[in-house]
C-alpha cells in the first residue's frame, strides 16, 4: 500500500444505480462513520510508517464497536477452543500433497502426518487451551511449513533434525511442543529443569526467552534465561536452579554453573539445540558435548534446528539421537526465496565505500539496513566513515556490553537507527522483521555464514535484498556464495563470468573457513594524505621525546 495514496485518498463513488436496497445497506455498514474517519486514516498512516511493527494497531476494517474489549473475552475464546475442528490433513496422500507444495523433504520411520492448522492440535494432541489462546492473542494464526512438520513429530516423542530457511518460524516450531509436553506432566514444584534450550549467542537466547514468555503466559511455569546476573545468584546460592521448569542459555555460561554443582540437568526431558550447525562447529562442539553428557535422563527427547545443516553436523546428530526424523524445508544450504541476492565486484577495498556512497546517490540505499563485516576493527572503522557521511548509524560487536547491545537493538527495532553495522554476532536467529537490505561488506567465510547473514532480511514472508561486495582477494571465498545463489534461484544477481568459476577443493574450503583474508584499512583518504599525517605524527612524537630529554638533563 502506498502511503501517498492513503494521504490523498478521496471518497469512492459507486456509479451503479441498479443495486438493491439490501446491497446499499451492506455497503453503508462497511464504511467507517464520519466520527471515525480521521482516526481510521491516522491509524492506517501510522501502520505504513512503522517499519518493524513495534506498535499495536487495530485492524483497519474492524468496526469501532468491536474495538472495545469484551468482559467475557476469555470465556468466549475457551468456548471456541472447545469446538474440535476436523483435521485438515488426514491421510498420507494429504501429507504428500502438502509436502510437494512446500518443497518439504521428510525422512525417517513412522513419520507423523503434519498439522494443517493450529486448531488441528486440539483434536490430535489435546493442545492446552491457554497455550493456543496465547498463540492467537500474539497473532500467530497459521502455522508455517516447518511448524506443521516439527510440532507433530515432537509431540509424538520423536527426536528431530530440522532445517528450514531463515525467518520461517523455527522458534515456535520447538517452543509450542516443548510447552505442551511440560504442561501435560503432573510434577511437583521445584522438581528441577525439565526443558533446556541452548543457543550460540546471548541475543538469540533473549529473543527465544521473550517468545517463550508470550506463549507460556498463565501456565504457571517458571522460565528463565541464564543471564550473567542469574548465573551469579545461582552460583552464590541466592537462587535455586531447581525452581525453574525451562531454562534458555548459551553453552559456556551454563557449563560454568553445572561444573559448580549448582545446576542439575539430569531431569531434562526436552532438549532443544538451536542453530545446531554453529553449536556443533569447532568453537562450540566441545561445550555442546559437555552439556549433553550432563543430560542423563533416559526419557530425554532431543531436537536441533538451523537454517543450514552440513553433512558433518547431521552425522554428529545421528550419533546422539535415537532414530531421529529429518525435516528439510527447501534446500539445506539455500536462502529464503523472498530475498533478492546480488554480487558486486568492487575491485579493491576503497571500491566498497565508493559502492555504498553510489547506492545512496542512486536511491538504492533503503533503510532499515544491516551491514556485516568480518572483524570488530573493521566494523568500528566503517561506523566512523558512515557517521562522517551523516548517516543515522550505530554499531554492535562483541566489545560492547550486553546492555549497550540490547539498547542498540531496541533503537534499531524502533526505527531510531536506520543503518546497523555489525559482525557475525548478529548473523544468527535475531529477528528483525522490517529489514529491507543486508550488505555483506566483507564476504562471509562459508555458505552457512552467508545464509544466516542475509537471513536478517526477507523474514516472515516480506521481501528483502542482499548485496555482497567482493574484491580480487575474494576469488575463492566468493565461490560458495555463488553456489547458494544458484540453489536459491537468484542467477539474475550473477554476471556470466561469475557462473563459470570452478569449484573449491576440500583443502581450499578449509582454508577459506579457517583463515580470514587480510584486508586494507577502511578509508577513502588518499595514500599521499595518509603519509603526510603519519609524518606529522612522527614529528610530534619526536618533539615530545626531545622536550622530555631536555627536562631530564
UniProtKB/Swiss-Prot annotation:
This is ATP-dependent RNA helicase ROK1. Keywords: ATP-binding, Helicase, Hydrolase, Nucleotide-binding, Nucleus, Ribosome biogenesis, RNA-binding, rRNA processing. Transmembrane segments: none annotated. InterPro entries: DDX52/Rok1_DEADc, DEAD/DEAH_box_helicase_dom, DEAD_box_RNA_helicase, Helicase_ATP-bd, Helicase_C-like, P-loop_NTPase, RNA-helicase_DEAD-box_CS. ATP-dependent RNA helicase involved in 40S ribosomal subunit biogenesis. Required for the processing and cleavage of 35S pre-rRNA at sites A0, A1, and A2, leading to mature 18S rRNA. It comes from Lodderomyces elongisporus (strain ATCC 11503 / CBS 2605 / JCM 1781 / NBRC 1676 / NRRL YB-4239). The gene is ROK1. Belongs to the DEAD box helicase family. DDX52/ROK1 subfamily. It is found in: Nucleus, Nucleolus. Residues 338-502 form the Helicase C-terminal domain. The Q motif is unique to and characteristic of the DEAD box family of RNA helicases and controls ATP binding and hydrolysis. ATP binds at residues 164-171. Its EC number is 3.6.4.13. A motif (Q motif) lies at residues 120-148. GO terms for biological process: endonucleolytic cleavage in 5'-ETS of tricistronic rRNA transcript (SSU-rRNA, 5.8S rRNA, LSU-rRNA); endonucleolytic cleavage in ITS1 to separate SSU-rRNA from 5.8S rRNA and LSU-rRNA from tricistronic rRNA transcript (SSU-rRNA, 5.8S rRNA, LSU-rRNA); endonucleolytic cleavage to generate mature 5'-end of SSU-rRNA from (SSU-rRNA, 5.8S rRNA, LSU-rRNA); snoRNA localization.
Amino acid at each position: 500500500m502506498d502511503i501517498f495514496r492513503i494521504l490523498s485518498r478521496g471518497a469512492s463513488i459507486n456509479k451503479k444505480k441498479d443495486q438493491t436496497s439490501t446491497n446499499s445497506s451492506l455497503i453503508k455498514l462497511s464504511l467507517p462513520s464520519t466520527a471515525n474517519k480521521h482516526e481510521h486514516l491516522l491509524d492506517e498512516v501510522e501502520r505504513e510508517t512503522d517499519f518493524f511493527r513495534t506498535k499495536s494497531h487495530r485492524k483497519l476494517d474492524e468496526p469501532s464497536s468491536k474495538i472495545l474489549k469484551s468482559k467475557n473475552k476469555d470465556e468466549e475464546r475457551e468456548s471456541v477452543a472447545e469446538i474440535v475442528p476436523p483435521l485438515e490433513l488426514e491421510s498420507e496422500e494429504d501429507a504428500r500433497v502438502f509436502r510437494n507444495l512446500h518443497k518439504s523433504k521428510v525422512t525417517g520411520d513412522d513419520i507423523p502426518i503434519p498439522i494443517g492448522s493450529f486448531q488441528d492440535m486440539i483434536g490430535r494432541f489435546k493442545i492446552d487451551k491457554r497455550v493456543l489462546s496465547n498463540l492467537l492473542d500474539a497473532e500467530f494464526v497459521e502455522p508455517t511449513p516447518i511448524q506443521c512438520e516439527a510440532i507433530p513429530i515432537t509431540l509424538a516423542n520423536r527426536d528431530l533434525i530440522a532445517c528450514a530457511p531463515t525467518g520461517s518460524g523455527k522458534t515456535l516450531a520447538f517452543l509450542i511442543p516443548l510447552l505442551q509436553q511440560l504442561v501435560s506432566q503432573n510434577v511437583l514444584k521445584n522438581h528441577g529443569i525439565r526443558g533446556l534450550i541452548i543457543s550460540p549467542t546471548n541475543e538469540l537466547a533473549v529473543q527465544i526467552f521473550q517468545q517463550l514468555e508470550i506463549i507460556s503466559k498463565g501456565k504457571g511455569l517458571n522460565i528463565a534465561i541464564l543471564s550473567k546476573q542469574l548465573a551469579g545468584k545461582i552460583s552464590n546460592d541466592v537462587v535455586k536452579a531447581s525452581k525453574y521448569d525451562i531454562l534458555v542459555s548459551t553453552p559456556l555460561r551454563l557449563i560454568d554453573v553445572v561444573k559448580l554443582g549448582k545446576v542439575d540437568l539430569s531431569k531434562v526431558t526436552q532438549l532443544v539445540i538451536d542453530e545446531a550447525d554453529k553449536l556443533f562447529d569447532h568453537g562450540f562442539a566441545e561445550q555442546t558435548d559437555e552439556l549433553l553428557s550432563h543430560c542423563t535422563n533416559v526419557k530425554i527427547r532431543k531436537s536441533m534446528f538451523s537454517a543450514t545443516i552440513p553433512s558433518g553436523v547431521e552425522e554428529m546428530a545421528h550419533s546422539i539421537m535415537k532414530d531421529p526424523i529429518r525435516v528439510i524445508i527447501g534446500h539445506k544450504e539455500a536462502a529464503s526465496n523472498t530475498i533478492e541476492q546480488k554480487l558486486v565486484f568492487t575491485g579493491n577495498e576503497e571500491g566498497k565505500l565508493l559502492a555504498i556512497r553510489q547506492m545512496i546517490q542512486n536511491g538504492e540505499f533503503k533503510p532499515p539496513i544491516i551491514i556485516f563485516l568480518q572483524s570488530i576493527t573493521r566494523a568500528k572503522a566503517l561506523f566512523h566513515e558512515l557517521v562522517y557521511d551523516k548517516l543515522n548509524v550505530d554499531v554492535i560487536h562483541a566489545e560492547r556490553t550486553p546492555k549497550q547491545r540490547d539498547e542498540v537493538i531496541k533503537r534499531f527495532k524502533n526505527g531510531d537507527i536506520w543503518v546497523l553495522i555489525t559482525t557475525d554476532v548478529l548473523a544468527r536467529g535475531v529477528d528483525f522483521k522490517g529489514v529491507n537490505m543486508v550488505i555483506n561488506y566483507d564476504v562471509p567465510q562459508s555458505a552457512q555464514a552467508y545464509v544466516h547473514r542475509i537471513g536478517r532480511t526477507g523474514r516472515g514472508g516480506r521481501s528483502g535484498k542482499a548485496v555482497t561486495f567482493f574484491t580480487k582477494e575474494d576469488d575463492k571465498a566468493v565461490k560458495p556464495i555463488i553456489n547458494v545463489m544458484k540453489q536459491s534461484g537468484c542467477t539474475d544477481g550473477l554476471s556470466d563470468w561469475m557462473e563459470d568459476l570452478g569449484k573449491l577443493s576440500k583443502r581450499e574450503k578449509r582454508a577459506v573457513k579457517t583463515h580470514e583474508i587480510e584486508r586494507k584499512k577502511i578509508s577513502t583518504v588518499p595514500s599521499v594524505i595518509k603519509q603526510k599525517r603519519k609524518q606529522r605524527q612522527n614529528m610530534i612524537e619526536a618533539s615530545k621525546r626531545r622536550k622530555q630529554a631536555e627536562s631530564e638533563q
